[in-house]
Amino acid sequence: MAASRKGKAVKAVKQEDLRRLMQETRRDSGRQKRVESPFARYSGAGQLMCALCDAPVKNALLWQTHVLGKQHKDKLQELKSRTAPAHTPAPAHTPAHTPAAASSSSSTLKRAAEPPPAPGKRAKLQTGAGAGLGLLAGHYDDDDDDEGGAGERKTAPPTDSALPADFFDSGPAPAPPISHSGSVSKAEQQESQEPPENRPESLPEGFFDDPVRDAQVRQVDTPKDQLEREWEEFQKEMRQVNSASDAIVAEDDEEGRLERQMDEIEEQMQCLRRVEELRAKQETARSRRRSQRREEEPMQEEEPLEEEEELMHILTQDWRAKGALA
């Protein structure tokens, strides 16, 4: 009875509970190793996803492998190419030349080049302008008046005219801004640029016998530098491939370890079930033996009584008589 109670007390854990516990432990370990990246995001169920590629990633160990993949690199390059034109400054478009603007600019330049007139010439110009205005107004005099007026005009100081006092003193008017169209500016830029035939890059490869000098003149890497750069790129690619393979191997090892643990748990559960079956069989065998013993005990008690009665009957008879022991 004590063994049966002990067997009932040891209960086997259900397989579903063990699977649930294993999933919770895996989920907790995944939560602890969160990926810190602007493109990494987690769903409501805790699944790691790439926001740039919109693709799920199994776990944090494979995030570096996904980042080094071709799909992620192409998406990142496409994003950079889309965002780059937004920051480039737009070329300034200026209006084209007009004939009126060209003529006005040439006249202002000529006026600026001429020397300022002398004071005597300035007075003569002022008096001449005043006389012209008087004739236009209709003031006509005789010849004598003209002569006397001429003498008086020679001695009289110059009077104010219709022109402003600082007409000739003021400098030349500022030239209007000359506008250029986009095509003109482009043409000027093309003229300012050096023609391709005069550039060092236009020289053919192997123009100089010395490969180092040839590379320096053409402003390219020397063969040694090129080999070193290619070697560094090769090593970088190999490191990336090795890191990706290490991540895959680590993931495979983790999955294999979890599978082995699940197999061991299932094997333990089968062993527990077998132990329980054997204990149940043992209990049934014991109960049968007890019942058989209980049935055999009264029969064993009756047999000694019969033997004693026969012995007493024999002893009471005359053993010397004929046929007494028959």
From Swiss-Prot:
- Indicate, by first and last residue, each region the UniProt record lists as having compositional bias (Basic residues): 1-11
For this chain's UniProt record, which GO biological process terms are given?
cell division; mitotic DNA damage checkpoint signaling; mitotic DNA replication checkpoint signaling; nuclear DNA replication
UniProt main location, coarse: nucleus
Q: Which UniProt keywords apply?
A: Cell cycle, Cell division, Chromosome, Coiled coil, Developmental protein, Metal-binding, Mitosis, Nucleus, Zinc, Zinc-finger
Acidic residues bias (residue ranges): 298-309
SUPFAM superfamilies membership: beta-beta-alpha zinc fingers
Per UniProt, the C2H2-type Zn-finger stretches lie at 50-72
Q: Got any disulfides in this one, which pairs? A: none
Pfam families, from UniProt? zf-C2H2_jaz (PF12171), ZNF380_CC (PF23406)
Q: A GO CC term? A: nuclear speck
- Report the subcellular localization: Nucleus; Chromosome; Nucleus speckle
Basic and acidic residues bias: where?
13-36, 276-286
Q: Where is the composition biased (Polar residues)?
A: 180-195
State the Gene Ontology terms under molecular function. nucleic acid binding; zinc ion binding
Where composition is biased (Low complexity), the residues are: 83-108
Q: Where is this region: Disordered?
A: 1-37, 83-214, 237-257, 276-309
Coiled-coil segments, which residues? 224-295
Biological function: May act as an important regulator of the cell cycle that participates in the maintenance of genome integrity.
Question: What protein am I looking at?
Answer: Zinc finger protein 830
According to its UniProt entry, this protein's organism is Danio rerio
